[in-house]
Amino acid sequence: MKNKSRIYLIASAFLILSVSSYSMHIMEGYLPVKWAVFWFILCAPFWIYGLVKLQKEAKGNVEEKLTLALAGAFIFVLSALKIPSVTGSSSHPTGVGLSAILFGPFITSILGTIALIFQAVLLAHGGLTTLGANAFSMAVAGPLVSYGIYRLLKKKNKSLAVFLAASLGNLSTYVITSFQLALANPSADGGITASFVKFAMIFAVTQIPLAVIEGLLTNVVMNLLEKYNIKQGVKA
């Protein structure tokens, strides 16, 4: 019962913090139709398999369900934070590393997409037409990187594995976002490559420090969960 209360309090705190948060995603109507559809198609297999795995996970005990809620709240709040950059753009954490470590990339693709839908509908962050692109970068690519890094390094140094999984999962999201923006807006001089470099450099100024912070914060949350034996291991 104490463990359940702790999870509930942590999740509630994250949700309360989200009230005054803001975010940066690819905005509504920004992508040409062909690219908007393309990213939806790429996300579809992850969503389908993710729903199957989420249904199985939801049949677990109350503690498992509360941990799912915590992972979802962590994604929603961190991805809703807005940090202005020196270039006039903005960056934010993603929060997907924690869920990828606890539940694997497929369930995380669902949790991340749900967070993006709520942000688009309730907070006017991102958009529904660009949901596929935003979901692929934050809810698919990021979790895959986080999951792979954690699985690769967890037996050598678990704390380092968590840190790198969350940090590099964050950075990979912005590498993909830069690529998505470059595909939709190739530079007149240099094409997609030049455009990608431009967007990546804009994001890097604030995103690298944010990735480090997210890695540290994810480690703190993981240590709390493991301290109370709330959830162990990773589920693919």
Swiss-Prot record:
Pathway annotation from the record: Cofactor biosynthesis; adenosylcobalamin biosynthesis
Bilayer-spanning residue ranges: 32-52, 66-86, 98-118, 120-140, 159-179, 196-216
A Gene Ontology molecular function term of the record: cobalt ion transmembrane transporter activity
Gene Ontology annotations of biological process type: cobalamin biosynthetic process
Keyword Secreted attributed: no
Main localization category: membrane
GO cellular component entries: ATP-binding cassette (ABC) transporter complex
Membrane topology of the entry: Multi-pass membrane protein
Keywords: Cell inner membrane, Cell membrane, Cobalamin biosynthesis, Cobalt, Cobalt transport, Ion transport, Membrane, Signal, Transmembrane, Transmembrane helix, Transport
Signal peptide: 1-23
InterPro entries: CbiM, CbiM/NikMN
The keyword Membrane belongs to this UniProt entry's keyword annotation: yes
A matching Pfam family: CbiM
Cellular compartment(s): Cell inner membrane
Subunit comment: Forms an energy-coupling factor (ECF) transporter complex composed of an ATP-binding protein (A component, CbiO), a transmembrane protein (T component, CbiQ) and 2 possible substrate-capture proteins (S components, CbiM and CbiN) of unknown stoichimetry.
Family: Belongs to the CbiM family.
Primary role: Part of the energy-coupling factor (ECF) transporter complex CbiMNOQ involved in cobalt import.
HAMAP family named among the record's database cross-references: CbiM
Protein name: Cobalt transport protein CbiM
Organism listed in the record: Sebaldella termitidis (strain ATCC 33386 / NCTC 11300)
Organism ancestry: Bacteria, Fusobacteriati, Fusobacteriota, Fusobacteriia, Fusobacteriales
